[in-house]
Amino acid sequence: AVGTILPAIAERLGINPAAIVASGGGDNMMGAIGTGNIAPGVITMSLGSSGTVYAFAEQPNVSPQASVATFCSSSGGWLPLICTMNLTNATGVIRELFDLDLDAFNALVEQASIGADGVSMLPFLNGERVPALPHATGSLQGLTMTNLTRANLCRAVVEGTTFGLRYGLDLLRQTGLQSQSIRLIGGGSKSPLWRQMVADIMHTEVVCTEQSEAAALGAAIQAAWCQSGEPLASLCDKCVSIDPASCTLPVAANVSAYQQAYQRYQQHVATL
């Protein structure tokens, strides 16, 4: 830590005059610390307005794919990361279109079958970074007179956004990053339905941390690290807790069904 904040600044900003001035970091770098992602073997996935997937690496394994950003971590290593531009912002647009609250939306998603009866959505409403399609727009494929339902459209947008994360996770795995489980954070992680979908599509166990605001927790842990000099790993062991009730395992039949739907997604992306 550099020291404590100047009294005049503390008064002007209305913050604790004992607040320390120390190194900081970006939201994903802090999210990594806040999920204990400070050593190889852990992958963090955030389901927010945008979606991110990242993992600690000891070396800068630069991917040939431009979609993978090889950031520095805030814990002394590297943080290969992918970021999609359309996640809960895309699902939110569909909710607003049908005037659904979150519970009603989730009920419709659950009502539809895996693969949304052939309906595929490329939810690139803001363009997209992963896949790298900055000028793309959103689109629907596979519509028929019988499958054009609210339930299928609701499921298609959730599946489509999650397939984007799978696309990015595959890019990270190609660089050698592996994990026995995915630590899920962000607003979408609160949905048991979405947790199961992530586990099935990624074919990996999913767990959440007890503190859902992982970036804020990470910033606090980093400040404690800078102030105390205690090893970061020790602080993470003390402060980062996994929520055992959130543990979600992939279901074999679902994994197979989602793989077929994901291949369809890949085929649609390849035409853009």
Residue spans for each PLM region:
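Active-site core segments that coordinate phosphate-bearing ligands/cofactors
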Residues: 3-185, 190-272
